């Protein structure tokens, strides 16, 4: 345990010894305000880490500061000693700026060990001398009218950064003060005596000194001028009345000096006051000296000065600011033009598209239309153009005449020329436009000339026509061939291929498809040589400028792709079991055709179903017509044969080697025929009346659906749907009619009207019921079956025919036992009564009695009174005598 503690202590000591340290940091340093650059603020050193790796150059450095400043940097002294100094990039002002700066100093050695410490810099206040503000710092002219009462003249004010901020007053003094002036401690200038101009007191030069609490001082000059009072008009002494000035003179430039003198103050013209009475924005005059200066920029080339370069001024001179004597004079300034505007152009970059077949000598660009010089007078407003320059432009373009700015084509711009292609058919012409007068201002004009290609060469195919062969067995998307068109014009534009005419069949509008980009011709569907052996296409190639077409002939190569087709394709045959061998069964003949094979190329064979090989075809090869023969007898008695119904699948192949072909081709097609053969056994019962056995031939006809007759099932289906809809509609109408005319529900009152009787021929009993009917019929309707009109009772539902028919004939009653009455159920209506069949009594001569009990039934099912029977019902339901009775 003790060893572990010692080991941890050693590791801690080693890790601490490996650290990189900034010595004498963190710390606080002081620097005086307004210190010059390079002033030392604080010195420190770097203790290297245990690896003794040196500090990376550029470190230590100040990585951050609060507040942010660039007023300090770290300088290397020697070895591992450094110091923080001022940079002079920012003014350190105790009164106006921050007083304390926290600088983060970062150091890093070559192995990556780092340290970061903070240096706090305090800006210390320094006593600064006081300062005069404004014009007072440069000296000031003061004017006092002669004979003015002694007293206040001027209040002098100065500023001291330290004392002013602490409200400590400054002390003002006059150095070597004359006896006529005195200054108070607060800076007030007083005159002590009345000043007389004529006595020689014309001006006084005073030096004012100000001192702060620290004894620092500053001084300025005061020129006190005594203004003379006089009654003489000042006289101008300057002889010049017209002045010439150049444009673009700097403001403040003296362009004229107007002088005058006052007889009252002879020899002291500076006491006069000058002014310009004319409104002018270009000139100003010193009111004391009479010097005229430029007030603002004078541009000879703009505004009214471009047309009239003269400026007239009226100068006023007077001997006192207010009142007194004055005089006026007219002076004129003529503004002369200087070459201050370079030749310029509306634009300095031109892009010209020139067709490649442009003739030599063609004017491409006239720069005179775009370039100008704003100077107003010659030669300042004149300019010319230098020789054109630019890679590859010297042999193609020229300025003609020289210096005219007219660029003329002198070379060849053929787009397909190799040298022009190497240049990219793009040319840069650089021309300088410059003044002809000093200082020869110039500007570069860049002219980019691009050659536009023209359609010089036609679009042609690499062959005048194309012939392609394709097998008729090839599937869709098979490549037939490829056409290619070229255009020698550059740049190459994309070509689009299309089939303009041809390539159609009876079933397909387009048998071929061409790739619009590559010109590859492909099949859209399989082709048939027997239908169309040759296709002639017109293929068109188009680019942006031209169109060309070529004829393409596609030969369809014939191959054995058609199956033999035989008639009939299926058939039903019947033969007696004892048919003679070699007999043509039912004279059956098979006729076959093949569109791509000769009649001698057929070979016939019977596949599954020919059990015991009873059947064969003759001939079995070399002919398109063959017959079905019986090759061996049937043996059902011996058990050799057991099948009576044969299903033969006949194969018809077009590879007969006995035909005119020397060998079988690679492609062989096989057709099939289905035969159904029924063997008729010997009859089990011998009919003596039949002199000889007969064979009944049964012909089986089978309807086979053909896709071309699609309309037949469609019409049948549509007609069935319409008929079914019509029947449903009629049933709905009938149901509505029954519901409308049968609103009542009546009870049943069934009574048998006759006794049951039996006869020899009677098979069933018929009970005739009658319905009691209301004699009041208040409605009429038409019977939907017969179309006749009947009357009905709206309450009971009873009905009767409106127009009675002929009454039933009355039969003499012979017996009531022969009547076999038929029961009319309650659900039957008029139609049931009308359609009832009555059986006649077997006894001859007897007939139904007049009141045989035939009645009618209303809709409620009640039996009616026989007295109210409708004669029409009786007429329709009388018994019929049996034939032969």
Swiss-Prot record:
GO cellular component: a single term: adherens junction
Tissue specificity of this protein: Expressed in bronchial epithelium from adults and in fetal lung tissue.
Classification via Pfam families: Cadherin
Transmembrane regions: 714-734
Parts of the chain on the Cytoplasmic side: 735-885
Single Gene Ontology MF annotation: cadherin binding
Phenotype upon changing residue 102 to A/N: Complete loss of interaction with human rhinovirus C
Assigned keywords, A-Z: Asthma, Calcium, Cell adhesion, Cell membrane, Glycoprotein, Host cell receptor for virus entry, Host-virus interaction, Membrane, Receptor, Repeat, Signal, Transmembrane, Transmembrane helix
Domain Cadherin: start-end pairs: 23-132, 136-236, 237-344, 346-466, 462-566, 567-695
Main localization of the protein described in the UniProt heading: membrane
Extracellular side: 20-713
Protein name (Swiss-Prot/TrEMBL): Cadherin-related family member 3
